[in-house]
Amino acid sequence: MRPKKTILCVDDNEQVLSVRTFLLETRGYRVVAVNTAQEAVEMLERSLPGTLDLILCDLLMPQMDGNELVRRAKQLHPGLPAMIVSGTVNAFDRALHADVFLPKGASSPAEMIERIRVLVARKRGPKKATPPATTQPPSVPSFAHATAS
């Protein structure tokens, strides 16, 4: 059995955080749920590289928005994929540093789970391809033919 992927989930709305945590855990993910971006930064500072597989956060939060949180997360963990979800969808509020932006209400939970699956797989890197078996004739030693003069 493959180890569970760990998602740092950040939302200042406790109800949204609870629902999102439940959704992810029932799909087999391990969730670290926090209510503030500052808590998330502290978690990121304490975590070893590779221990988190994705950060999923709200765009609009008090003290620090999702863009700033993702920017800091990527400074601390450069390969960490990030998804921002928000109910506000205007050009100025779009996620600048996230790999994926999903508007709340315009995307289904199934779409969010699929995007998470793709991001986590991308973090892991492409599947290692096995080199194709080549059928070459066995090498035959070559002998220099001496010509009699």
Task: For the regions a language model picked out, list residue spans one by one.
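Acidic, metal-coordinating helix/loop segments flanking the phosphotransfer/catalytic sites
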Residues: 33-54
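CheY-like receiver
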Residues: 121-149
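Conserved acidic segment of CheY-like receiver
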Residues: 4-15, 20-24, 55
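Receiver (REC) domain active-site loop signature in two-component systems and cognate sites
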Residues: 61
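C-terminal output helix
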Residues: 105-120, 124, 128
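Active-site residues of response regulator receiver
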Residues: 58
